[in-house]
């Protein structure tokens, strides 16, 4: 089937099903191109909750579709590739987190949204890479348990006077970016600014001109007068950066910055999902309610 025909069929079915198509910033270019909304995982789930769509087609990974289900329990949430998981989210289970909580009684758990619904359900508050510092510093407690990303946790800890207990999780894709990769590119392009995601290793973060979430990268690159940027996050972000800034050059910090799970979803998968109305991601109420509480506490913290 020709790509144009697939796109037409997707658009037709989205209309028929009263569905909204969400694509994460790391998706394949052709999936981002056809999406109704692109963004980071939480922003997408919040946007979806605000729409009057009956069906959410989430082009992302499993925990993202769970977040959409948590925030929109009355909508049908489709994840075109049920095998699109997140290795970092899988590094922590609710049972293991409860054991850690038992070792640190009365210490609040701050959980990065890149986590399963079950883990969110036994957490006190969630955070994103954009608001993690603000979330942690909003808590009155002198200590926090930070789950699951140790790299983001260390980035936050440098901007907080609290004592941190880190879960030993990480994003394998971001972890593949090495300081030597960055130094080599900075030498080759001395006029370029290096911006990276806080999921990168602290040794890489130390080299950055700016550290921010994916949504922060779009804003920074659009408003900064520099004409050349070295990008330290997953390759999918380049699609929109180049689209929005045709006069600027974007260099991926390493060819290893490709997440295999984010690249699983194809246009064919999206079409098949709409045709069959499957696979469905539905978070059970006993997990959804406490998980939503952790997300709601985060959402209630005022933005700058």
Swiss-Prot record:
Catalyzed reactions per annotation: iminosuccinate + dihydroxyacetone phosphate = quinolinate + phosphate + 2 H2O + H(+)
UniProt record, GO biological process: 'de novo' NAD biosynthetic process from L-aspartate
Co-factor: note: Binds 1 [4Fe-4S] cluster per subunit.
Keyword terms: 4Fe-4S, Cytoplasm, Iron, Iron-sulfur, Metal-binding, Pyridine nucleotide biosynthesis, Transferase
Cellular component terms (Gene Ontology): cytosol
Primary location class: cytoplasm
Pfam families: NadA (PF02445)
Cofactor: [4Fe-4S] cluster
InterPro entries in alphabetical order: NadA (IPR003473), NadA_sf (IPR036094), Quinolinate_synth_type2 (IPR023066)
Entry-linked Gene3D superfamilies: NadA-like
Residues that bind [4Fe-4S] cluster: 86, 171, 259
Residues that, per the record, bind iminosuccinate: 24, 41, 112-114, 129, 197-199, 214
Subcellular location: Cytoplasm
MF (Gene Ontology): 4 iron, 4 sulfur cluster binding; metal ion binding; quinolinate synthetase A activity
Physiological role: Catalyzes the condensation of iminoaspartate with dihydroxyacetone phosphate to form quinolinate.
Protein family (similarity comment): Belongs to the quinolinate synthase family. Type 2 subfamily.
Protein name (database record): Quinolinate synthase
């Amino acid at each position: 089937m020709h790509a144009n025909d697939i796109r037409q069929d997707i658009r037709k079915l989205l209309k028929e099903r009263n569905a909204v198509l969400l694509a994460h910033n790391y998706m394949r270019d052709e999936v981002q191109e056809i999406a109704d909304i692109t963004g980071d995982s939480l922003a997408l789930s919040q946007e979806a909750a605000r729409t009057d769509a009956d069906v959410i087609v989430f082009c992302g990974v499993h925990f993202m579709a769970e977040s959409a289900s948590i925030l929109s329990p009355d909508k049908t949430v489709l994840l075109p590739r049920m095998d699109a998981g997140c290795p970092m989210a899988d590094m922590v289970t609710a049972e293991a987190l409860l054991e850690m909580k038992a070792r640190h009684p009365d210490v609040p758990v701050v959980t990065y949204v890149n986590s399963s619904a079950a883990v969110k359900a036994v957490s006190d508050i969630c955070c994103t890479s954009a608001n993690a510092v603000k979330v942690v510093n909003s808590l009155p407690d002198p200590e926090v348990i930070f789950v699951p990303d140790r790299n983001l946790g260390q980035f936050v800890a440098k901007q907080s006077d609290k004592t941190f207990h880190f879960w030993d999780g990480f994003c394998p894709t971001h972890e593949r970016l090495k300081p030597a990769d960055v130094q080599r590119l900075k030498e080759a392009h001395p006029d370029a600014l290096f911006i990276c995601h806080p999921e990168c290793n602290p040794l890489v973060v130390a080299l950055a001109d700016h550290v921010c979430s994916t949504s922060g990268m779009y804003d920074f690159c659009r408003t900064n007068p520099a004409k050349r940027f070295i990008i330290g996050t997953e390759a999918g972000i380049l699609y929109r950066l180049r689209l929005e800034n045709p006069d600027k050059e974007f260099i991926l910090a390493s060819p290893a910055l490709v997440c295999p799970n984010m690249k699983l979803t194809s246009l064919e998968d999206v079409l098949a999902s709409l045709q069959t109305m499957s696979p469905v991601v539905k978070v059970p109420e006993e997990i959804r309610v406490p998980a939503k509480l952790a997300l709601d506490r985060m959402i209630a913290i005022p933005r700058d």
